[in-house]
Amino acid sequence: MIFDAQTHLFSRWYYAALWKQKHGSEPSDQDLHCMLKPVGLAAPPGDPAEHAALLVQQMRHHGVDRAVLFTSLPGEQATVAAACKASAGRLIGYTMVNPRAADALPLAHRDLTELGLRGIELFPAMHRFDPSDESLVYPFYELASRSCVPVFVHVGLLRVKLREKLGMACPYDMRYSDPLRLHRAAADHPKVNFILPHLGCGNLREAAMLGAACPNVHIDTSSSNQWMKLMPEPLTLERAMAVCLEAFGPNRILFGTDSSVLPRGYRYDIKESLELAMEAVELGAEDRGKIMGGNLARLLGINDE
């Protein structure tokens, strides 16, 4: 089974929310078209089921069986849940949580119990919080533990390029992007499975240290890994994979693409790059199968056999 650990819906709701943040009004279809066309994007179908059908069609074309579908802004959960419901089990949704919002905890509980979402996403730099803040964030880890769902924690470089292209503010605080800020929380919640993205996204060393210290921390391979261009020493995907195999082992690495926008669609090129990197580090067929889907299926309790 090929199971992508990270994709984004980037629904019409999402683009409308960006428009409202920028202009303070509800957009028309023409407004969205005018906003997206100059940056090379197309507005997706307004119907989540139709949008999901497009995603699944692209996944199947590239040999991908399932994918995790991220919520990309708090408030998009119902749309993501509707897309997942229409996908016949091929899309598995996560909910984005801003722990600083007053109603975040009851909404997260609703998302997991009523909407059927199966993971929690945290973006510490985006929402400006320490992921090991006991009073603010630990209740969400306890919810994840009770619900038997993983917790995704974004680390490393955070850029939402669409916001940048649209001239929108990106008031992030990357002091909270260090993977080691999660160490105390991961150690305090050994039954919670944590997932870091993008091979550490510029913090490979710190992500590897955390993975070596905490057996409940996993890492995904998603995105085109443009952050490697920022490293003071040359770094390749093959070398990054070798480091992660040493720190996490083949049981805690998850294939992902970070696929999102239309018309580009599914990032099959990222999938192919990972397959070449695994071949380069001489990974056996069993371990490749774990990384490409088996590990994530285990975390989410999915068994297609």
Predicted regions and their residues:
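Mid-to-C-terminal alpha-helical segments outside catalytic/metal-binding sites
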Residues: 1-61, 66, 243, 248-254, ...
